[in-house]
Amino acid sequence: MEPQLLFEGNSPEFDFLGAVKAGFPSPAESIREHLDLSSLLVRHKASTFFFRVDGVSMVEADMDEGDILIVDRALEPYNGCRAVCFLDGEFTVKTVEISENGALLRPANPAYKPIPVGPENNFSVWGVVTWVIKKCTP
């Protein structure tokens, strides 16, 4: 058997991604950049607020009891947004559906009914939910 060239002409170039540990990895060695949670999670500092979820009406929207909601009051509410609303003296978080007849506050749990909102209600969309912070361990 005669030896053959593996590649004819120029050999191809491959990306070199860096070293890979064969022992215990050091998390600090793979840091490429630092993450500032404040700049990631808060667009409008003066109009951003935090709420803790109390209840289970939004569980199918991944808003579970005890989660922290980041709510931005500077954002314009839109049809289908998840928002903290002020309804007849109380705060609630729901999906907001806007129509010519008013609004419908839709829960994300089939055990709860949608809440129709009309001119007789004291109602406002207080702020749009931009992030949900979850705790993954007990």
Model-derived regions: residue spans:
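Short, positionally conserved secondary-structure boundary motifs
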Residues: 1-59, 90-91, 98, 131-138
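Short polar/acidic secondary-structure junctions
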Residues: 42, 74-76
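Short, compositionally biased
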Residues: 49, 79-93, 97-103
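Residue-level recognition of conserved beta-strand edge/terminus positions
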Residues: 71-72, 86, 132
